[in-house]
Amino acid sequence: MRWLVFWVLSALPVLAEGEKAGEFDYYVLSLSWSPNWCATTGDARGSEQCETRHDYGWILHGLWPQFHQGWPAYCRTPHSAPSRRMTREMEDIQGSAGLAWHQWKKHGTCSGLSAADYFALSRKAYDQITRPAVFRKLDRSVKLPASVVEEAFLKANPDLEPDMLTITCRDGYIEEARVCLSKDLNPVPCGRDVIRDCRLEGAVFDPIR
């Protein structure tokens, strides 16, 4: 029985809080389709990100330091927290200053970088991945296989291989595209605990608001 419990626990993703900053294996760049997040979460919160004046599509959820199994979080760091100006300057790609702050606190502290350098690296990673333009052309909600979203990203980014990208779903909606990158932001294969491809054949994909 004890061996069974050990096996089950060892198979679960590992969250290592309070790890030393800068000690990790690679990054996960997480891109969220804003209209779908608004439909499942943001509207209920009254999030400003979901107002039509913003025209958000694929936004940066975060750049996450990752182990080959598990991930660090809320690390000890000698660097100061970001200023309000720094987090506001990330709104154009992250949707809100609040998200930028949370991402620094949970993930940025584990990068070993200052807040300014972490945000700069996050922006660089976001900019180097081409977000497929086809999704911005939708004029109505559609249902599609999650594999179609993955194929669109692979076509738009020839340097990516299928094992370097995963598409996630939540509550029947396409949720995120997650790309695995080295510390130098070169595409790398994802760990087994990151590859969780959505298998839905009819995932909802909402248009830009």
Segments from the language model and where they lie:
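Betabetaalpha-Me/HNH-type nuclease active-site subdomain
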Residues: 18-96
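C-terminal, well-folded lobe of enzymatic/effector domains
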Residues: 21, 82-83, 92-209
